[in-house]
Amino acid sequence: MYTAYKSAGVALITPFHKDGSIDFKSLERLIEYQITNNIGYFVVLGTTGESATLNKDEKVAIIDFVVELVNKRKPIILGIGGNNTQEVVNCINSTNLDGIEAILSVAPSYNKPSQSGIFQHYKYIANASPLPIIIYNVPSRTGVNISAETTLKIANELKNVIGIKEASGNLPQIMHIINNKPKNFLVISGDDALTLPTMALGGDGVISVIANAYPKEFSKLIHFCLDGKYDEAKTIHYKLLDIINAIFLEVSPAGIKAALEILKLAPNNLRLPLVPVGKTTNSLISKLIQNL
């Protein structure tokens, strides 16, 4: 069940022109590059897609564009989350979900709910959503951690929640989830640098930032892990580790956008309050790419 997500998914960027408008030509080029290089699936309008700086009409335009272009060649997961539970449900219900297979919903940020509040938040969303939900734990951004106990409660009690994107960086927590979860509940790495150890511990795949630039390599890493070929996976892991670390030296997605411009895949433009990486980081990323 949901075996398509036992692979490398890409957390797709949103390319912009210098004037801040959406660069659909670059988005098309990037999507075709991903498909050609065997990416498993797309995650649209997540953190890496700068969804927080897109208005409703822009989000609709991106969804429609991606769904039409992908044309069922790969699964598409849509990011819809927030710290107003009712508004998240309203957004899900008002969005045309044709061509979308699942919803990735980040934990509520800023208002810092209790673990009970987090559970109730996802229960309300799961009961209202016509599509399966993947929860997203990224405490470095949200200010709240979805504990292993809460994740397992969600996994056991909310049947419309099919997995978690785990980006806490907390391997003991991830191990506890993997060791105690229901069989079909997916544990997906949300941290490129920890993908190999997460897979070795029993994880199911990754939603990756670096895959925007290196989809073929990261897809191979995941498939090697799934086949138990960890020596081969380790070779790719260490080959990419320096560039992975470099693109996260400054707030993402600034680093990956710098890399994509160097690779001539997309322009290095972000929307305020995000800005491009500094010269030192950009030079390092450029040097590492040249050495790959």
Model-inferred region functions:
Residues K18, F24, K56, A148, ...:
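Alpha-helix N-capping/helix-start residues
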Residues L27, K59, I63, V88, ...:
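A general structural signal for well-ordered alpha-helical segments in protein cores
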Residues A128, R141-F248:
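Catalytic alpha/beta core domains of metabolic enzymes, predominantly
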Residues Y2-V10, T14-G143, K153:
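Active-site beta->alpha loop and helix N-cap motifs at the rims of alpha/beta catalytic domains
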Residues F24, E28-I31, A148, N282-I289:
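Short, amphipathic alpha-helical "lid/cap" segments that border enzyme active or binding sites
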Residues A4-P15, N37-I39, T48, I207-L292:
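C-terminal alpha-helical cap/extension of soluble enzyme domains
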Residues N137-V138, N160-V161, R271-L272:
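Glycine-rich phosphate-binding "P-loop"
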